[in-house]
């Protein structure tokens, strides 16, 4: 059994770790609330944009935008949003597993693939994973701006425009609630048709002054808005996962401290018993 002094040192070390994880839990909780507010503010716009674009994809247009054309999938692109930092449980691992499973399914069909990782963990993973990394972004912080993503997303859009990509997806952790964050893969291009009941009839819009100029701008903004929404959803998911992970670490540290305290008490009791025995033995000898 370890000595009482050694155990006491271990207890002090675990207590210091517990203070750190407890502080990180509180910081993550505060950041999560702010991230939820940003996510809630941008989600209605992203969902409305997705609905309108779904209707446009269902409509009969004189001008057929390239983003509406379904091509044979020879090359697939993924914009993968992960975190910049760790200590958030299995959030990134589960996301990467989902991407790899989807990549394997496309690979079985003979398609090639390339990636646009967003977040330091995503960049690190896909540079080691294999496959072309066409663009990347990291260090966006806790309050990213759309302008920070336009250049990175633009690289993938340019590849699609030039026929170098036939499918484009965005992958991120969708925030459901504090305890649940779900990795999702959403198709960006070609534009997915709306599955709402409202599309049972054909939707047609009047485009003024020119459908080409309007759609060229609108559809690019649509892709950018969906990627931005994925980023803010992932940040909220990250802070929620980190808060839960740090709470679990704090609780585990508390249990470990209790166990070590019992061991310390036994070691101290054994030491006292040993000292008493030595005193009694010494007295008997006299």
UniProtKB/Swiss-Prot annotation:
Domain of life: Bacteria
CDD domains attached to this UniProt entry: F1-ATPase_gamma
Keyword Metal-binding recorded: no
Function as written in the Swiss-Prot or TrEMBL entry: Produces ATP from ADP in the presence of a proton gradient across the membrane. The gamma chain is believed to be important in regulating ATPase activity and the flow of protons through the CF(0) complex.
Main location: membrane
Subunit structure and binding partners: F-type ATPases have 2 components, CF(1) - the catalytic core - and CF(0) - the membrane proton channel. CF(1) has five subunits: alpha(3), beta(3), gamma(1), delta(1), epsilon(1). CF(0) has three main subunits: a, b and c.
InterPro entries named among the record's database cross-references: ATP_synth_F1_ATPase_gsu, ATP_synth_F1_gsu, ATP_synth_F1_gsu_CS
Any one GO molecular-function label of the UniProt entry: proton-transporting ATP synthase activity, rotational mechanism
Keyword terms of this UniProt record: ATP synthesis, Cell inner membrane, Cell membrane, CF(1), Hydrogen ion transport, Ion transport, Membrane, Transport
UniProt protein name: ATP synthase gamma chain
Lineage of origin: Bacteria, Pseudomonadati, Pseudomonadota, Gammaproteobacteria, Alteromonadales
SUPFAM superfamilies: ATP synthase (F1-ATPase), gamma subunit (SSF52943)
Stretch forming the signal peptide: none
Gene Ontology BP term (one): proton motive force-driven plasma membrane ATP synthesis
Cell membrane listed as a keyword: yes
Compartmental location: Cell inner membrane
NCBIfam families: ATPsyn_F1gamma, PRK05621.1-1
Membrane topology term: Peripheral membrane protein
Example of a GO cellular component annotation carried by this entry: proton-transporting ATP synthase complex
Gene3D superfamilies: 3.40.1380.10, ATP synthase, gamma subunit, helix hairpin domain
Similarity comment text for this entry: Belongs to the ATPase gamma chain family.
